[in-house]
Amino acid sequence: MLGLLAPAAWSEKQQAHLKFLVLKEHNGKPVRNASVVLHLVNKKGKQARGGYELKTDPDGKASFDGCPYGKLRIQVLTPGFQTFGEDFEIDQPEHEFVIKLKKPQDQVTIYK
């Protein structure tokens, strides 16, 4: 797990344990070494500075302890797949996320 300028908000009292499973959408196989990036989001939808970056293990799994309750932006990036990004409301002691990454779309051009 890599911390990126962890804001003070990460140390709030109500905290959750997050589990991630990153899979290939086309065959359901795990994605190893994918970056799972976590950013807090304020009530106006603005992303806070700092955050955390996790890496998935060979089984496509990653976890994080100590996420404060509130809105969280989760992004998953890895070469060869479309970037996943979505906001989630963290409001329970434990959350599990199954993220299915899609292959990149074909690029279309008018130039030859």
Regions found by a protein language model. Name each.
Residues L2-L18, L23-E25, K29, E96-K112:
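Beta-strand-rich domain onsets/edges
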Residues Q15, Y69-K71, F81, E94:
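Extracellular Ig-like/FN3 beta-sandwich strand-entry sites
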Residues A16, H26-K44:
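Short, ordered, surface-exposed loop/turn motifs in non-cytosolic proteins
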Residues K43-K61:
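Short, acidic Ser/Thr/Gly-rich low-complexity loop/linker segments typical of extracellular
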Residues Y52, A62, E86, H95-F97:
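Short strand-edge motifs at loop-to-beta-strand transitions and within beta-strands
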Residues P58, P68-Y69:
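Surface-exposed loops/turns
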Residues C67, D91-P93, K102:
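Hydrophobic loop/turn residues within beta-sheet-rich immunoglobulin-like superfamily modules
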Residues K71, Q75-F88:
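A short, solvent-exposed loop/turn motif at the edges and junctions
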